[in-house]
């Protein structure tokens, strides 16, 4: 059996209380960015969801360092994928006895970091 040299680590955050469209704005922003630069950008981002993305990214970095022994300074975010999760359906009373439906969207976030060679 041939064993591959694994040089990437992943982390995931599931059932985040934000729509996938809003989460994808932040995920697309950090995609293909160096981890150190992405952490600075997420720290000072005005988006509410940036804190959750930062926590997930720090988890991926910790997985890379502790489980695989990768060098933190050479890590790059290769994948930042967003997926839809459940939708909570709620009812809001309106005028004249009517009611409308409110959808509360949840999302999943998957981050993969890879160690890149210095050129």
From Swiss-Prot:
Biological process, per Gene Ontology: translation
InterPro entries: Ribosomal_uL22 (IPR001063), Ribosomal_uL22_bac/chlpt-type (IPR005727), Ribosomal_uL22_bac/org-type (IPR047867), Ribosomal_uL22_CS (IPR018260), Ribosomal_uL22_sf (IPR036394)
UniProt entry tagged with the keyword Transmembrane helix: no
Pfam families cross-referenced by the UniProt entry: Ribosomal_L22
Keyword set, alphabetical order: Ribonucleoprotein, Ribosomal protein, RNA-binding, rRNA-binding
Molecular function (Gene Ontology), one example: rRNA binding
Coiled coil regions, renumbered to chain: none
GO cellular component, one term: cytosolic large ribosomal subunit
Function: This protein binds specifically to 23S rRNA; its binding is stimulated by other ribosomal proteins, e.g. L4, L17, and L20. It is important during the early stages of 50S assembly. It makes multiple contacts with different domains of the 23S rRNA in the assembled 50S subunit and ribosome. The globular domain of the protein is located near the polypeptide exit tunnel on the outside of the subunit, while an extended beta-hairpin is found that lines the wall of the exit tunnel in the center of the 70S ribosome.
UniProt family annotation: Belongs to the universal ribosomal protein uL22 family.
Oligomer and partners: Part of the 50S ribosomal subunit.
Protein name: Large ribosomal subunit protein uL22
Gene name of this polypeptide: rplV
